[in-house]
Amino acid sequence: MASGGSKSVASILLALNLVLYFIVIVIASWAMNHGIQRSREAASVLTTPARIFPIYFPMGNMTTGFFIIFTLIAGVVGFTTSITGLNNIFQWNAPNLDAAAMSSLTTWALTLLAMGFACKEIELGWTDSNLRTLEIITIIVSATQLLCTSVIHVGASEVTLQRIARV
């Protein structure tokens, strides 16, 4: 009975994370494309060390490049983890839940790294509305990924205990 509750909560959280990570990918991809297109003209007026630096974005502040790159990586990994996690949750056996738990933990670690850059970007300021949206969604998805990781770990331990009790 308890594993059914964990299964439904994990499915809902994985579906929510799938949507949130897709939004993160779309906004971070737009920001990356915008930065690549505008960096040549914006960086031409800078001094030599700043022109050579490959992670210069004409919007935001000095953490914007790192924030966008790590958010894009976390978004792609999180989207993939959510898709495979839904498959693993629907099968609901120990090996699949262990795989879902480990990939969920890895995704949460990457999302926390992106969230750290989001917090630094918020602290420094000077960001436009698109970057503020990406920062907020990154912070929200790190919290939902923590909940999802916790629920999957609870479900994996329940299935393992049930398997041990049967033997």
Regions found by a protein language model. Name each.
Residues 3-24, 28, 60-118, 135-155:
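Signature of small four-pass
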Residues 1-14, 23, 34-55, 126-167:
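Intrinsically disordered terminal tails
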Residues 119-123:
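Juxtamembrane "helix-exit" motif on the non-cytosolic side of transmembrane helices
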Residues 101-104, 125, 129:
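Short amphipathic alpha-helical interaction segments
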